[in-house]
Amino acid sequence: MKKVVLFIIILIVAWAAASFTRGIFAAKGSPMKGLIITGHRGGAGLGEENSIECIKRGMQAGAESIEIDVHITSDNEIVVCHDPSLDRTTTGTGAINELTLEQILQVNLKDSLGNATAQKIPTLKQVLDTINGETELLLEIKRKNGNNKGIEERVLEILKENNALGYTTIQSFDDSVLEKLHSLDPSLKLEKLLFGKLMGIPVICDGTFKKFSTEKYSYIRSFNFFHMALGKNLSEYLHKNGYRTRIWTFDTPEETPQIKLDGIITDRPDLF
């Protein structure tokens, strides 16, 4: 039995590797005109990721879109942070969903070298005040795994209160998040994050393996792929069926694959 399981795992890994090869060996060149350049975590190569200062720098660098990550606190506030805990990016520790906003505001963000800065974790409201419709906001709700209960409703409430729905798109790896948002408001602009699609079969990898069909994701506007996993044929197929595509995350303009794309998510929007 163990040998059978091992064989299946090896088969899946080999199949996934073959699928990724399409993107790795795709023709490369300078970025195509019309691509939406998105500052990943605000433009993380320009400052402390997901900080207000970083977002401002990303906008100043010409990013047409700013990407952020959000989590919900124990007192139902929405804060902007990539990780579910404070440990990596701040001077504090602890899970965000177990802390109040007041507790979170007691800690400072760290720079890329691990040194404390004067920057604080911002709230979603502060980010909306900063962007104010000057760029698109690409907002990622992280995979829930029992955390972030009620985050969809609270995010939607804040976006409506701040008249931000018109310039906000929400993305997630988690189908349950996307499905919940669509049920709350079918007019929301929603995008599906994924690592890639297995070659030759209707299976995608988004942290889990699941069946892919255009019918299942009919409410999705765009599929956002790991940059080495989207090849020409798949991109053309998705566009033919009415979807857009973005790729994440890389910082070298000359490595942009020469395939049909709608956007690039990068830590260095200033280089594009």
What label would you give each PLM region?
Residues 2-272:
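Phosphate-group recognition and catalysis centered on beta-loop-alpha active-site segments
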